[in-house]
Amino acid sequence: MAPSTVAVEMLSPKEKNRLRKPVVEKMRRDRINSSIEQLKLLLEQEFARHQPNSKLEKADILEMAVSYLKHSKAFAAAAGPKSLHQDYSEGYSWCLQEAVQFLTLHAASDTQMKLLYHFQRPPAPAAPAKEPPAPGAAPQPARSSAKAAAAAVSTSRQPACGLWRPW
């Protein structure tokens, strides 16, 4: 039987779904296979350690990924929880490094120089608090990354006016 071309407009919704179903299923399988291949690449060292010189099946890859994630989670729990201050400091440092990297990638403008100078300045002494901080309050950020910002900028100018902040 020769293939026939039928106008899609003439098909009923039920027939359209029947034609579309294999295409959708193939796309779903392709996504699954792609994700399994990415897992295999991410966990390549783990696979080499447990099963050297073996052809891994998809089920093996998924089992190894689950095992690795469980092991990683248990290891992180055994290391102990981070304090809020440490967690905040790490996040602040990472954000500051990203901002400095972004600012140094582009041609220097007056605004960029002001921002970089602002990142380099030591923090102003905090006013004494009338009440003790709440348990969930964010601690003061670590300023070790401010030194990294200073090293990233070879020249720093004193800004003529204060830096505008939206807060």
UniProtKB/Swiss-Prot annotation:
PANTHER family: BASIC HELIX-LOOP-HELIX TRANSCRIPTION FACTOR, HES-RELATED. One of its GO terms (biological process) is negative regulation of transcription by RNA polymerase II. It comes from Mus musculus. This is Transcription factor HES-5. Has a particular type of basic domain (presence of a helix-interrupting proline) that binds to the N-box (CACNAG), rather than the canonical E-box (CANNTG). Transcriptional repressor of genes that require a bHLH protein for their transcription. Plays an important role as neurogenesis negative regulator. Keywords: Developmental protein, Differentiation, DNA-binding, Neurogenesis, Nucleus, Repressor, Transcription, Transcription regulation. PROSITE patterns: BHLH, ORANGE. Residues 139-160 have a biased composition (Low complexity). GO terms for cellular component: nucleoplasm. It comes from the Eukaryota. InterPro entries: bHLH_dom, HES_HEY, HLH_DNA-bd_sf, Orange_dom. A motif (WRPW motif) lies at residues 164-167. Transcription repression requires formation of a complex with a corepressor protein of the Groucho/TLE family. It is found in: Nucleus.
